[in-house]
Design a protein with these regions (language model features):
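Acidic Gly/Asp/Thr-rich repetitive segments characteristic of extracellular carbohydrate-active
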Residues: 34-69, 347-348, 386
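N-terminal signal peptide c-region/cleavage motif recognized by signal peptidases
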Residues: 23-26
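Glycine- and acidic/polar-rich repeat regions and solenoidal domains
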Residues: 72-75, 92-108, 116, 120-342, ...
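Beta-solenoid repeat scaffold
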Residues: 59-67, 71-95, 108-112, 349
Length: 395
């Protein structure tokens, strides 16, 4: 039987490192369960499209969508506690320029929604912010999904009791090209967790933008690659209690902005103004100068520790503490040309990290490495801590 766990609980489990919120098994054969029905979608099913399922879904239902392409199919999901899951592969919602309510491919109005194994692409709206998912309900978990060629990948509203967890998912080539639409845009919610994901090739906008009160951006691959032209890699415009740990961050040659991580640039409006930037690898390939971290606001608590900075001379612009960061043009990468940023045995970053301590009860020492594609590998206990986000090649 499939037991639902709230998005809030999943976020707590994942960010605390108690146990990963991994993909849950599909419900067993019976078409009903103690929490709701199982609605099956596909060419050979009574419900041929996801939108047909959305029209009849009740609270607690699980919608199993056969792996296939559903061109031009858009939907509003109003029921609470839904599971929306692609089966036996990815269910591709190829909007082809269409949208629900001139907002998104899927407008999710219900609370506590789980989305797995779904690909959403091609949303366009007159306001130029057509999203793969527009989250209007409270609480969303997204896992093993893909968002591409929309004007926004995911766009959420403001809800001070909403928690957003996104993991093992990919965002690319989203944006209207105007700088106001992004691969991923989280509104003023309680917490946002992004882990084991890849965000790349935003069309002028940011790879990750969040106004959440708390942000946990952990073990991701955030890159322009050869031909991307994003703005900020990570934008936290209102600050917030934010942990940025173990990410591979790259500014490409065509990046629009010279700042990788921007904090509180639109005003320190969130209750907490604490930023911990620990064990990230930053590669700047812009010809112009670049800054790894720019901080605004008065008297925020900011610590940048154990970061590996390549191609930029500036780690931190603005208030804060910078400790044990390695700025070098000779980092000892295994194969930088192929974006393999693991360390060779002779790298000056190998084993050169220091204990970053804790933020409250949150342990700042990285527990994982990002692993392509869209995965992770645990950091071996007892290994000396490197500087940067990557392990030694061959280990």
């Amino acid at each position: 039987m499939h037991h639902r766990t709230s998005a809030r609980r999943l976020a707590v489990i994942s960010t605390a490192g108690i146990g990963l919120a991994l993909a849950q098994a599909a419900p067993a054969a019976p078409a009903t369960s103690s929490i709701g029905r199982v609605l099956r979608v596909g060419a050979s099913e009574p419900l041929r499209t996801p939108s047909a399922a959305a029209a009849v879904a009740h609270d607690g239902d699980t919608v199993e969508i056969a792996a296939d392409t559903y061109p031009g199919d858009v939907a509003v999901w109003s029921a609470n506690h839904l599971t929306l899951r692609g089966m036996n592969g990815m269910a591709h919602l190829a909007a082809n320029g269409k949208s629900a309510q001139q907002k998104a491919i899927w407008v999710i109005r219900g609370n506590d929604t789980l989305v797995e194994h779904v690909e959403l692409s091609g949303c366009r709206v007159p306001d130029r912010n057509g999203a793969g998912i527009r989250q209007e309900g409270r609480g969303l978990t997204v896992r093993h999904c893909s968002f591409h060629d929309n004007e926004d990948g995911i766009l959420t509203g403001a809800d001070p009791q909403s928690d957003i967890l996104i993991e093992f998912s990919e965002f690319h080539h989203n944006g209207a090209g105007d700088g106001y639409s992004h691969n991923l845009y989280i509104g003023q919610v309680r917490s946002f967790t992004l882990q084991f994901c890849a965000s790349h090739h935003a069309k002028t906008g940011h790879l990750v933008k969040s106004r959440a009160q708390s942000n946990f951006i952990l073990y991701n691959r955030l890159m322009d690659e050869e031909d991307g032209a994003s703005s900020y890699v990570i934008d936290l415009p209102n600050g917030g209690r934010s942990m940025i740990i173990g990410n591979i961050i790259q500014h490409g040659a065509h990046a629009e902005n010279g700042v990788a991580i921007s904090y509180a640039a639109e005003g320190a409006k969130n209750a907490s103004q604490e930023l911990q930037v620990v064990n990230n690898t930053y590669i700047n390939e812009r010809k112009a100068s670049a800054v790894f971290l720019r901080v605004a606001g008065q008297n925020p608590t900011v610590r940048a520790i154990n970061n590996l900075v390549v191609g930029s001379k500036s780690v931190l612009a603005g208030p804060g503490e910078s400790s044990n960061n390695l700025v070098t043009d000779a980092p000892g990468f295994a194969d930088a040309a192929r974006h393999d940023f693991r360390l060779v045995a002779q790298s000056p970053a190998r084993g050169a990290g220091i204990d970053p301590g804790k933020s409250g009860e949150f342990n700042l020492t990285p527990a994982f490495f990002y692993l392509d594609p869209l995965g992770s590998t645990p950091r071996a206990k007892g290994d000396k801590l490197n500087i940067g986000a990557c392990p030694v090649s061959g280990k």
